[in-house]
Swiss-Prot record:
Domain of life: Viruses
Species name: Grapevine leafroll-associated virus 3 (isolate United States/NY1)
Protein name according to UniProt: Protein P21
Length: 185
């Protein structure tokens, strides 16, 4: 598990099989990586109640090529294995993303949006902010019937509630502190 901020670039030759897929995770260098985990609340002006909350992140914990593509890529972006056996949860959402969005260039952020309906009820959407080859920004929503929907939401909520605990920690401390992580298989 890594909590560095990343940007995922995707290159694929149109009309060619998935063997032409190249995926690179670029590290974004920031002094405090969790400053890139953003929480926004939207309130009703009449009542003052929160009607919507958005959490988004660009951490490698969520935006790992391993999790998004269920594959391992080398430094040149070439897939070296799609036979992933891990103790961590994988999402494998890229194929669905490609069905809905043509020519994906970058996967920039992931997050969830909760719309409060009253009586303790909320409607939740999981999203990925994507940039296409023609520089259009698209917010792609994960289908609620996708097999990884609950897992992605659990990971996002876990990261949101634990991010303060990981500030300034090294990898070993992070591992010890994250023993309560629910995303192990």
């Amino acid at each position: 598990m890594e909590f560095r901020p990343v940007l995922i670039t995707v290159r694929r030759d149109p009309g060619v099989n998935t063997g032409s897929l190249k995926v690179i995770a670029y590290d974004l260098h920031y002094d405090n990586i969790f400053d890139n985990c953003a929480v926004k609340s939207f309130r009703d002006t009449d009542t003052g109640f929160t009607v919507m909350k958005e959490y988004s992140t660009n951490s490698a914990f969520i935006l790992s090529p391993y999790k998004l593509f269920s594959a391992v890529f080398n430094k040149e972006g070439e897939m070296i294995s799609n036979d992933v056996g891990s103790s961590f949860r994988v999402y494998n959402i890229f194929s669905q993303m490609c069905k809905d969005i043509n020519e994906i260039s970058e996967i920039q952020r992931a997050g969830y949006l909760e719309t409060y309906l009253g009586d303790g009820q909320a409607d939740t959407d999981i999203f990925f902010d994507v940039l296409t080859n023609n520089k259009a920004k698209v917010r792609w929503l994960v289908n609620k019937d996708h097999s990884a929907w609950c897992g992605i939401l659990n990971d996002l909520k876990w990261e949101e509630s634990n991010k303060e605990k990981f500030k300034g920690r090294d990898i070993l401390d992070t591992y010890v502190l994250s023993s309560d992580y629910p995303g192990f298989k």
